[in-house]
Structures are given as structure tokens and as C-alpha cells.
Amino acid sequence: MRIKVLIPNSGMDRKTLNARETMLSRAVSTETEISVDCIQSGPVSIESVTDEVFAGPLLLQEAIRAEREGYDAFVVYCFSDLAITALRENVDIPVIGPGECALAAADILSNKFCVITTVEGNVSRTYRRLMQNPITQKKLSSVRALNIPVAELRDDPDATCVYLKKVCAEAVAEDGIDTVVLGCLGLA
């Protein structure tokens, strides 16, 4: 099986992409080939609806190319699952949205959960989107921000991890949650 993973951020270097490929390859069988790339132009990160709109057509081109090249599935490497409905309309291979997957797992595992996103500007947008889903509206307690932009998450991984633990602890104490969903794949 061959899976194409596309990060909807532009300008990522090959070393970073290879690191993601290695990380993801550890989670699949040895018979599965994972190929990770990013969009070649467009937004540097997905932090707004505008970023999603600009990245969407680029994702569509890449999904069509992946199907043409014989990939068995296409993964949009972003919690927002941007453009997955349009991608599914245009290709016959499965299109996977990690946000959908994470929220399905949270529904199964949790009584009450919190989504941790990157910046404060994403909180209300993410909350509104999640509250449109009948499954998440029952169990979503809150959406909280790290206040670290996507492009800076890996600048100081130790500091990001310390702050992430702090925000998670606050969500447990203040919101009574039992599960945390990371709302950015840059936190993986």
C-alpha cells in the first residue's frame, strides 16, 4: 500500500519532511510506503480560513496527482481537514482527515474533551466548527490556545512541550476534561 501525505504548508525543507515521513512510517506495516510532501506555494501555515482557501486548490491538484501516480490513499496533514470534501468529490482513493480521526477517537475514549490549538485567533473558529458536529457538541468542553504559531512550534520543542503540559493541566483543572485532542499536527 502507498499513502501520500500532504502538509498544506509551503516552504518546508526536505529534512523536515523526511523526519515526518520517518515518524509516520513507524506507525504502519512494513508493507506500507508513506510519502510526505508539502505544497510548493501558498501559505506557510494554516492559521485562518483565508489560509485554507488558498491551500485548498493546491491540495486538490496534489490529490489528483497522487491518484494518477497510483497512491492508495491521500492524507491531508492538518487538523482542520481543509478541503477534504472537495478532494473526496474529485478522486476515487480514500482521503483521510486527521481531525476527523482524532475527534472520532475522542468520542470513543472521553466523557469530556478539550482541543488545544496553536494561536488565540483559532479558538473561536475551531469551537464554532466543532460545535456543528453532533458528535463533538456532546463532549467538547473547550478549545484552548498555546499562543505559539504553527511555524514556531518546533523552534524550541522542550519549551513547547512544557507549555503544552501547562495548558493541558489547566484544561483538566478548569474544564473537567479527561481527554486532550491536539488541534495541530505540528504538535505530533
Model-inferred region functions:
Residues 9-13, 77-82, 119-122, 184-188:
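Gly/Ser/Thr-rich loops at beta-strand to alpha-helix junctions
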